[in-house]
Amino acid sequence: MDIILASGSPRRRELLSRVQLEFTVISVDIDETPYQDESPEDYIVRMVAAKAEAATVQLNRQLKNNDAHIYQSLLSKPIILLTSDTIGVLPDGKTVLVKPNNREDAYRMWQQMSDSTHEVWTAVQATQLSLQPKRSDEFNNEQVWQIINQQQIIERTEVTFVALTLEMMSDYWDSGEPADKAGGYGIQGLGAAWVSRINGSYTNVVGLPLAQTLALIKEMNDTDTL
């Protein structure tokens, strides 16, 4: 099955490209605001499911508008739609760290992570889509992408920070790197200087647990051949 990565993250694209996986990219936009008292697991599962739903709607809109020329090679067989979301979780197991809204928000998160260990969670959903007759229009031969199978995984990695000073936080924010990253840091960039130890998947902290994602894709492909 061909693969569509529904993500605007350049880091996820880079990780999949490293293993020479062929895939098409689309970007989706959803509201990523956590609900009040929503647990980290409930939040991250909701995010990847919402991204998959938004991507499916987008693919069907392009199909209806005959604007799917870049996906023509995908129209004759099922596809795997990959969606992913990464968050930080404080030691209390309840506080979700998403992308900082501004400098003050970033400082607040970093102060909570300073000289301590937090977790980075990434959820990945593989959704198998197949072209099926539109249920409400069975006599016009119109087809739409419909979900026929989906699986999720959640990977957790422990990350320990050094003690952070105000100068370190100020310099890092001014670098421009933190703004689009969960927890406000990038372990693959300047943020690596803050990390004294990790326990678990490094690529999970970057934004996609690579080995686990490839295993999920293989499992989905194997299921399709049964």
From Swiss-Prot:
Main location, first listed in the record: cytoplasm
- Which catalysed reactions does the entry list for this protein? dTTP + H2O = dTMP + diphosphate + H(+); UTP + H2O = UMP + diphosphate + H(+)
Cofactor dependence is on: a divalent metal cation
- Name the keywords, alphabetized: Cytoplasm, Hydrolase, Nucleotide metabolism
Q: Matching Pfam families, A to Z?
A: Maf
Q: Where in the cell is it found?
A: Cytoplasm
The source's domain of life comes to Bacteria
Q: Which InterPro entries match?
A: ITPase-like_fam (IPR029001), Maf-like (IPR003697)
The disulfides recorded in the entry are none
List the NCBIfam families.
Answer: maf
Please explain the role this protein plays, according to its UniProt record: Nucleoside triphosphate pyrophosphatase that hydrolyzes dTTP and UTP. May have a dual role in cell division arrest and in preventing the incorporation of modified nucleotides into cellular nucleic acids.
Q: What is this protein called?
A: dTTP/UTP pyrophosphatase
> Which organism was this protein described from?
Psychrobacter cryohalolentis (strain ATCC BAA-1226 / DSM 17306 / VKM B-2378 / K5)
